[in-house]
Amino acid sequence: LDSTVMCLKPGLVLLNSKRASKDNLPEIFNKWDKIWFDDVAPTSEEELNFQKDIRDPVAKELSRMGFSSNLGSMSSPWVGMNFLSLDPETVIVDERQENLIKVLEKRKFTVIPVRMRHIYTQGGGIHCATLDTIRESKLEDYFS
């Protein structure tokens, strides 16, 4: 879900246009402004090589020994859309997602770029890697 539909603030949603469409979007978003986006940065050569040269051989050896692991798997490039909203104007985004950063900045978001070194091999992005947060703000209903 985090790499497909991201509610940015009341009335504005970021949508992965390769996964979401007008046909499958929940009606609750009909009146919202939509940012359709599909230009994520590809998985880097460094990460692909790390997977091929390190993780895959270890996964094979573990399997041979009778153990199961997720070392043979990588996240899709769409994990780059998995970012964290701090408040309705501020988001933390993987620094490699330059196109996404530009789109968000064009919509007047303050973007805090951070390096997620092993984002594709860990199975999640910034939002997935974040512990529970407590916001000091008033509770808002995004869908009324």
Language-model features: where?
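Histidine/cysteine-enriched polar flanking segments
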Residues: 1-144
